[in-house]
Amino acid sequence: MLVLQLATGLFLAIHYQPNPHLAYWSVLRTIQRDSHWGWLIRDMHVVGASAFFVLVYLHMYRGIMYGSYKKPRELLWLIGIFIYLALAAEAFLGYLLPWGQMSYWGSAVVTNFVTAIPVIGKPIAQWLRGSFVIGLPTLNRFFIFHVFLMPVLLLALVLVHMIALHQVGSNNPDGVEIHDNVNETGWPRDGIPFHPYYTVKDLFGVSAFFVVFFWFVFYRPDGWGFLLDKLNYTPANILHTPSDIHPLWFFLPFYAMLRGVPDKLYGILAFAGSFALLACLPLLDRNPVRSIRYRSPLYKLNILAMPLSFLWLGYIAHGFATEHNMVYGLHVTEIFYATFLVLPFFNKPRSPRVTLTWLILAEAVVWMIDVWMYSIHAHGWGLMLLTDWIPSLYLLLLFGMALLRPAWTRDAAYLPERLTAGGIFH
C-alpha cells in the first residue's frame, strides 16, 4: 500500500496546484476530468489512504494479541509506533490539499491544537501556518511536507523497521522463539522457506484485499461519506464555518477523546496519551507469556475490549457534538485507557486482597475524573451520574469476575516449546 500511495501521489502532484485559488479546481477539473485516467488515480489514492490505515490497525492489533511488543522486540514495536505517527502526520498534511470545505476547517482546528501550549503555543501555531490563518503559505508548506518530507521519513522508518525485524525475527501466534530449537545445520526446526509458502499465502491475502479495495475504487470511492467527506465537494469558504467539523474515519476515536474533555489542554493530553499507551505496552505488560492463546480468560476479555472501545469512540465521534455524545466519549475513553492500565494486574497471579485493591483504586480514579469534570462545569452532574456506569461496570465486571473466579486470571499451565496448529484462542 505504501508503494501504491507513493506512485499515485506522484502522478497527482504533477497536476496539482498548491494555491488557494487553484487547488480545488486543479483536483476537480484538471485531475478528475482533463487528465487521462486521472479520476482512477485520484480514487485509488483516496481509497488507498483508508486501506493503509485498515492494514496498520489490523497489524497493530495482531501484534498486541500475540505479544509482539515483548522482549526481544521492544525496539521493533517502538519503531512501528513511530511509523504509525508518521503515517498520521502524512494523512493530516494531505487532508488540506484538496482545499474543500471540511479539509480547510478540519486543518484549522488541528493547527490550533498547539495554541494550548502555554506561552509558546500561539507563536508555534503561527509559524506552522506561515500566517495568522490558513492560506497560501500553509498550503505550500503542507504540500511540500506531504509530497517530500513525510514520504522520505516513512520510507526510512520502514527500512529501519525491516532491519530490526531481520535482527530479532518475526513473532508467531504461539509466541514461540523458533530460533531456540534448531537442527544440525542451524536451521530452525519449525522454520519454512519464504518461497513458496509465504509467497502463496500472502498472494492469496493480497488478492482478496485488492478485490475489496478496487470495489470501493470503482463503485464507492467516497465510502458513503466516510472516505471522502461530502463537504469536500464544495470549495473552502473561510467565511462559513460548518455546523460540525470532524476528521476522517481513522481519526474519529481520537476526536471523541479530544471532544470528551472540554478543556483544550487536557483534551489534547488525553488524545496524546492514547499514543503514549501504545508505546508503553512493553512496560505495562511484563507477563512472560506472549500469545493470547495461552493467557487467562479475563486477559482475553480485556484485549477484546480494546478494539471494541476504539470502535465505540469512532461511532460517538461521528455524531454531532451534543453534550450526551461528549459525556459518552469521556466514559468510553476511560474504558479505553483502562484496558491498557490494568495490564500490570495480569503480570502474575494476584490474591483476593490485591484484586479488591485494584478494583477500589480503579473505581476511585474514574470517580475522581468525573468529579473533576463536574467541578470545572464541563458537564451537568445529572448526566454524569446517568452515564458513569459505563466505565464502572467494565471495571466491576473485570475485577469482580477475578474475585469470584480466580481461575479465570490464570494463564495456561503448559506452554508449547514448538509451534502448534491451534486457533487464536487455542
What is the meaning of each model-derived region?
Residues 1-51, 55-426:
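Membrane-embedded and interfacial regions of multi-pass energy-transducing membrane proteins
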